[in-house]
C-alpha cells in the first residue's frame, strides 16, 4: 500500500508566535540576566584589584572551551542525523495505523527544528559542562616537567599531572559524542524507514547498516584507547584492603597485562565490526562484542582476583614490598616529607631534670603560653569591644613580635572588626548599615605568656590578658601601644565583617563625613574612606547594576551616593585570594599582622593534585578536622589530594583590600604552570619584604595533613610498613569537652631545628603510639625565616605519657582536684582547661603545661568572661600546680626552676588604664573610678559561708551591671551599679 499523505502540524497564528517569542525572551532574560550582571560586576571588581587579566583569561578560556566542545559534540550528533536523513529510503511502504508514520510527519514538518535544534541543544549542554574543565585544559597547555619519573613506565610526573587528565577528558567527550551520534542515527533511520521492524525479520537498509556499524566500530576503538590510558591510572589506584596507594603486585603482574590484552581484543573486535560493512553479516561484529564483554570479565576481573587470592595474600608482605617502597617514596615527595625537609632525632622524653637545667631553657620557660586563643575571646570582647557593633572572632590568632626588650614573644592577636549582625534598632537602617557603620577600628595584641595579675590578687583584672592596642584615639590620632607601630587601624576588610549577607559598604566623599569613627565625651566623630580600593559607584550604569545585583532600590534613589562614591564588597580575605587565584586552595586560618605599619591579613595558598603516582590520596576535611575546627564549625570543604604545596603566601590589606600574591615554593611545577597561565599575578619570592617574612608562619592545614601522613610514612622498611606495627596516631584532644584530634599549637620555644637555646616560632604536635596513649614522637615545624619549613621529629622510645595520660594525671591530682573543687563549688565558677602544650625542656625531657581558667557561674554564656586562675604542669609523672608559671615550675623541679619564667604583668590594683596612658577602644559613657578590692578567687581548701557566697554573686552582678552601663553611656545606671557594688562588698566583709 502506498504511503499516506503526511498529517500536517497545525500552524501557529501570528499572535501565538509573538507570545511564544516574548515568553522565550523572558525566560532567557531570567536565566541569563543575573549571570550577565555578575559577569559585569566581576569585570569591574577584578579591574579595581588590578587582576582583570585573570578574569579575561578565565572568561576567554571558558568561552572557547564551551564553543569548541559544543561545536564538536553537536557536530558529531548532527552528522549522525544528517547522514541518516540524506540516505533515507526514497519509498517507504506504510502499513495501516503505523505509529512511525505520525512521528515521521512531525519530523518532516519541523525538519530544521529537529535536525538543527537537537544537536544544538546537546552541543550547548556539552559546552556548558566542558567549560567547567577550563583549568584542566590550561594546565595541559602550560604544564611542564617535574624532573621526576614514575618507577613503572619511566614517564615524567608532569604527564600524570597535566597531560593524562586532559586525555581522559577528551576520551570521555568522544565516547559520549559518538554514543549520542549512534543513538541519533539509529532513531533517525527508524523514523525515516532505514530500519523497519514490521514483519517477521524486519529490514535494515545498507546505509543504516554501514553507518551504525561504523559508529559501533569507532566506539570499540575508543574503548581500546581507554584500556591504554587505564594502564597509567593504575599508579594512582588503591586496591581495597591494602595499606598503601598505587599499583601493587596484582596490578603490575595481572591487571596491567590484562589491560594490554583487552586493548588488543578491542582492536580485533573493532576490525571485526568494520568488516561487517563489506561482508554484510552482522553476526561477526556481534560475536566480537560478546568476546570483548567476556574478556573484560574473565581477563579484566577474574584473572586479577585469582592472582590476588592465590599468589599475593599468602605472601603479601614479601610480594608487595617493592610497591610499598614506591608508595613511601612517592608520598614523601608529594607531601613535602623528604629527607631534606624532615629531620629525625632520637629523644628520650623522660630524662630527669634539675632546677638549674630547666631555668637554663630560657627560650622555653620565659615563653610558656598561658593564653588559649580559643578561650580568651570573651575577655577581649569584655575589655576591648567598646561598642555593640564591634566584634572579635570566637577563635583568636597567634603571631609573634619582638617585645620592648628585643625578645621574641608570641601574642594572641585580633582585629576589632565591625559585625553588621550586631547592629541594633535604627543602626540596621540601610543608610546606617551600609554608609555609616562601615569599618572596624583597632588591632589588639596580648602577650601570650602572661596576664594582668594573679587572679586571687585584690583587683578585678587579675587573670585577664594584658592588652596592647593600636587604635584611633579619642582625639582622632592613631595611638600605637601595640607590639608594632600601625599607621592605619581602620579595618574595612576581614572575615568577621564579611560573614554576613550583603557585606558591602558605600564609601567616598559626598558632602560631610558620614562613617562612624570614634566618640569623645562631647560628640561622635565621622570619617571618610580615602583608600584606593573600591568600585566606582557614581554613574547611573553602576548604580543600576548594583541595584540589580543586591536587589536594593536604594542604589538608585538614595542621595548618599554621589559622583565620588565607591562600593566595597567581597570583603573576606580568603575569598578575595581565591577569586584572583582560582587555582589555589586556601588555609582555613587567616590571621592579621602589622607589616610595615600596615595591617594586613595573611592567607596561605596551596596548589594540589589528586593523581600523583603512588602517593596516598588524602581527604583534606578529614585530615584537618581537629577539636577546634569541629567546635567552631570551621571544617574545610571535602577535597581529596595526593600532592600539596604551600606554594603561595598572600596578603590582603585590611584598609583598602589590596591583594598581593607571593611565590613561596620556587620549585613547585604546578605553581609554575599557573604562573604561565596568569603571568604577572604572582610576585617572585624575592619580593617578600623582611618585615613580612617575620610574620609568615607554617600553615596549620598543611601541618595537620603532614602529621597524619607521617604517622605512617615515617616507616622506612616496607615489611614493617605492611604490618602497621610501627605506625603512630594523632592524639585525641584530652579536653573533656573536645571530640576530635588535638590541634597543633603555635609557640615560641627553644629552637629544635637548630638544636640550640635560641627562641624560635614553631608549630608543634605530639604523636601517640598506634592505638595507645603513650608518646611516639614530637613534631615541630619551624616558622623562622632562616629555617622556615623545616620539620624536626623527635622519636621517643619507651612508655612516656601521651597527652591523654598527662591530662588525666593533672586533673586527678589530689591537690589540683581539691583546689578546683573549692573554686567551682556550688556553681560559683565554671572551670575550663586550656590547651595542653607539650614542651621539650632540659636534655631529653618533656614538660606538659595546661592553663586553668574560671568564669563566673556554671554556664558558657557570652557574658561569662574566663580568666586564668592556675597553671598546671606535669613532668615524668609528677604534677606541679600554682597561680603562676614560677610556682608550678618550683613545685616540679625545686627552687630556682622558675627563675627565667615570665612573671605576672604588673597592674595597678583595680584601676583600669586611663585613655592617655594606654587607651582602651573608643567607648561612650564614663570610665570606671578606682573600685574597692573584690574578694579573691579561693585558693586551697577554703570554705565560704552561704552568706559570703550570696554576697559574691551580688558583687559579680553589680560589676556586670556597671560594665553594661559604661558601654551604653548611662550615668544614672552606672552610679546605681556602683552603689550596689559597695553594698555587696560590705555584705561580704560583714558575713561570717
UniProtKB/Swiss-Prot annotation:
Belongs to the UPF0182 family. It is a multi-pass membrane protein. The keyword Transmembrane helix applies. GO terms for cellular component: extracellular region; plasma membrane. The chain crosses the membrane at residues 18-38, 63-83, 113-133, 175-195, 210-230, 259-279, 287-307. NCBIfam families: PRK00068.1, PRK12438.1. This is UPF0182 protein BCG_3215c. Its main location: membrane. InterPro entries: UPF0182. It comes from Mycobacterium bovis (strain BCG / Pasteur 1173P2). PANTHER family: UPF0182 PROTEIN SLL1060.
Amino acid at each position: 500500500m502506498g504511503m499516506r499523505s503526511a498529517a500536517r502540524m497545525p500552524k501557529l497564528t501570528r499572535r501565538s508566535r509573538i507570545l511564544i517569542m516574548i515568553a522565550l525572551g523572558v525566560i532567557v532574560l531570567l536565566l541569563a540576566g543575573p549571570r550577565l550582571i555578575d559577569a559585569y560586576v566581576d569585570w569591574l571588581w577584578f579591574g579595581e584589584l588590578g587582576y582583570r587579566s585573570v578574569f579575561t583569561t578565565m572568561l576567554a578560556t571558558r568561552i572557547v572551551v564551551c564553543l569548541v566542545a559544543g561545536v564538536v559534540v553537536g557536530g558529531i550528533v548532527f552528522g549522525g542525523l544528517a547522514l541518516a536523513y540524506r540516505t533515507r529510503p526514497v519509498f517507504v511502504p506504510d502499513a495501516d495505523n503505523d505509529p512511525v508514520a505520525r512521528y515521521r510527519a512531525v519530523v518532516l514538518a519541523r525538519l530544521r527544528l529537529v535536525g538543527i535544534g537537537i544537536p544544538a541543544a546537546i552541543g550547548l549542554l556539552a559546552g556548558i559542562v566542558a567549560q567547567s574543565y577550563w583549568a584542566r585544559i590550561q594546565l595541559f597547555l602550560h604544564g611542564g616537567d617535574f624532573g621526576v619519573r614514575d618507577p613503572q613506565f619511566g614517564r615524567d610526573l608532569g604527564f600524570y599531572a597535566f597531560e593524562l587528565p586532559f586525555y581522559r577528558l577528551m576520551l570521555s567527550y568522544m565516547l559520549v559524542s559518538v554514543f549520542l551520534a549512534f543513538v541519533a542515527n539509529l532513531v533517525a533511520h527508524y523514523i525515516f524507514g532505514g530500519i523497519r521492524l514490521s514483519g517477521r525479520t524486519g529490514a535494515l537498509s545498507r546505509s543504516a547498516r554501514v553507518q551504525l556499524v561504523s559508529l559501533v566500530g569507532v566506539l570499540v576503538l575508543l574503548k581500546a584507547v581507554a584500556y591504554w590510558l587505564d594502564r597509567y591510572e593504575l599508579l594512582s589506584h588503591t586496591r581495597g584492603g591494602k595499606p598503601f596507594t598505587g599499583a601493587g603486585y596484582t596490578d603490575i603482574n595481572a591487571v596491567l597485562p590484562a589491560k594490554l590484552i583487552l586493548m588488543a581484543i578491542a582492536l580485533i573486535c573493532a576490525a571485526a565490526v568494520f568488516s561487517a560493512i563489506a561482508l554484510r553479516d552482522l553476526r561477526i561484529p556481534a560475536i566480537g562484542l560478546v568476546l570483548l564483554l567476556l574478556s573484560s570479565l574473565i581477563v579484566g576481573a577474574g584473572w586479577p582476583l585469582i592472582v590476588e587470592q592465590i599468589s599475593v595474600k599468602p605472601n603479601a608482605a614479601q610480594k608487595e614490598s617493592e610497591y610499598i617502597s614506591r608508595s613511601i617514596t612517592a608520598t614523601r615527595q608529594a607531601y613535602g616529607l623528604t629527607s631534606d625537609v624532615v629531620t629525625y632525632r632520637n629523644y628520650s622524653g623522660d630524662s630527669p631534670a634539675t632546677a638549674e637545667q630547666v631555668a637554663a631553657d630560657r627560650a622555653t620557660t620565659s615563653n610558656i603560653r598561658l593564653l588559649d586563643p580559643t578561650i580568651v575571646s570573651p575577655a577581649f570582647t569584655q575589655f576591648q569591644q567598646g561598642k555593640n557593633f564591634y566584634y572579635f572572632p570566637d577563635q583568636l590568632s597567634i603571631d609573634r613580635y619582638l617585645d620592648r626588650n628585643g625578645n621574641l614573644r608570641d601574642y594572641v592577636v585580633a582585629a576589632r572588626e565591625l559585625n553588621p549582625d550586631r547592629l541594633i534598632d535604627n543602626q540596621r537602617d540601610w543608610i546606617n548599615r551600609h554608609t555609616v557603620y562601615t569599618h572596624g577600628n583597632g588591632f589588639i595584641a596580648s602577650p601570650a605568656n602572661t596576664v594582668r595579675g594573679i587572679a586571687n590578687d585584690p583587683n578585678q583584672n587579675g587573670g585577664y590578658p594584658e592588652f596592647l592596642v593600636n587604635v584611633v584615639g579619642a582625639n582622632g590620632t592613631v595611638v600605637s601601644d601595640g607590639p608594632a607601630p600601625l599607621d592605619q587601624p581602620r579595618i574595612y576588610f576581614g572575615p568577621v565583617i564579611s560573614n554576613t549577607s550583603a557585606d558591602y559598604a558605600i564609601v567616598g566623599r559626598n558632602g560631610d563625613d558620614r562613617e562612624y569613627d570614634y566618640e569623645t565625651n562631647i560628640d561622635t566623630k565621622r570619617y571618610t574612606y580615602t583608600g584606593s580600593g573600591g568600585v566606582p559607584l557614581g554613574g547611573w550604569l553602576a548604580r543600576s547594576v548594583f541595584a540589580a545585583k543586591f536587589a536594593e532600590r536604594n542604589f538608585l534613589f538614595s542621595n548618599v551616593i554621589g559622583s565620588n562614591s565607591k562600593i566595597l564588597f567581597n570583603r573576606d580575605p580568603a575569598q578575595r585570594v581565591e577569586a584572583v587565584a582560582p587555582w589555589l586552595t586556601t588555609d582555613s586560618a587567616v590571621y592579621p599582622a602589622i607589616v610595615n605599619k600596615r595591617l594586613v591579613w595573611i592567607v596561605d595558598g596551596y596548589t594540589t593534585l589528586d593523581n600523583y603516582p603512588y602517593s596516598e590520596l588524602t581527604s583534606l576535611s578529614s585530615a584537618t578536622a581537629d577539636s577546634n575546627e569541629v567546635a567552631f564549625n570551621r571544617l574545610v570543604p571535602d577535597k581529596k589530594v595526593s600532592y600539596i604545596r604551600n606554594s603561595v603566601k598572600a596578603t590582603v590589606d585590611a584598609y583598602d583590600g589590596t591583594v598581593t600574591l607571593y611565590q613561596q615554593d620556587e620549585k613547585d611545577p604546578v605553581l609554575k604552570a599557573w604562573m604561565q597561565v596568569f603571568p604577572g599575578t604572582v610576585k617572585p619570592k624575592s619580593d617578600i619584604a623582611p618585615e613580612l617574612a617575620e610574620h609568615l608562619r607554617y600553615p596549620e592545614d598543611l601541618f595537620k595533613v603532614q602529621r597524619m601522613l607521617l604517622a605512617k610514612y615515617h616507616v622506612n622498611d616496607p615489611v614493617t610498613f605492611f604490618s602497621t606495627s610501627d605506625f603512630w596516631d594523632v592524639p585525641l584532644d584530652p579536653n573533656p569537652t573536645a571530640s576530635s584530634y588535638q590541634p597543633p599549637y603555635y609557640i615560641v620555644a627553644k629552637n629544635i631545628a637548630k638544636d640550640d637555646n635560641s627562641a624560635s616560632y614553631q608549630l608543634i604536635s605530639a604523636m601517640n603510639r598506634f592505638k595507645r596513649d603513650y608518646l611516639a614522637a614530637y613534631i615541630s615545624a619551624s616558622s623562622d625565616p632562616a629555617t622556615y619549613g623545616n620539620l624536626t621529629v623527635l622519636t621517643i622510645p619507651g612508655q612516656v605519657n601521651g597527652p591523654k595520660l598527662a591530662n588525666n594525671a593533672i586533673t586527678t591530682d589530689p591537690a589540683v582536684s581539691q583546689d578546683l573543687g573549692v573554686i567551682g563549688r556550688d556553681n560559683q565558677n565554671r572551670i575550663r582547661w586550656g590547651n595542653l602544650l607539650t614542651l621539650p625542656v632540659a636534655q631529653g625531657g618533656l614538660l606538659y603545661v595546661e592553663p586553668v581558667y574560671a568564669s563566673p557561674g556554671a554556664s558558657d554564656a557570652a557574658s561569662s568572661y574566663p580568666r586564668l586562675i592556675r597553671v598546671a604542669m606535669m613532668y615524668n609523672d609528677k604534677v606541679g600546680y600554682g597561680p603562676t608559671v614560677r610556682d608550678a615550675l618550683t613545685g616540679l623541679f625545686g627552687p630556682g626552676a622558675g627563675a627565667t619564667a615570665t612573671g605576672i604583668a604588673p597592674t595597678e590594683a583595680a584601676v583600669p588604664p586611663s585613655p592617655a596612658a594606654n587607651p582602651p577602644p573608643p567607648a561612650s559613657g564614663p570610665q570606671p573610678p578606682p573600685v574597692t578590692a573584690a574578694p579573691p578567687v579561693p585558693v586551697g581548701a577554703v570554705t565560704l559561708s552561704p552568706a559570703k557566697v550570696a554576697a559574691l554573686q551580688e558583687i559579680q552582678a553589680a560589676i556586670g551591671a556597671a560594665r553594661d552601663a559604661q558601654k551604653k553611656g548611662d550615668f544614672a545606671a552606672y552610679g546605681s551599679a556602683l552603689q550596689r557594688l559597695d553594698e555587696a562588698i560590705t555584705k561580704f566583709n560583714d558575713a561570717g
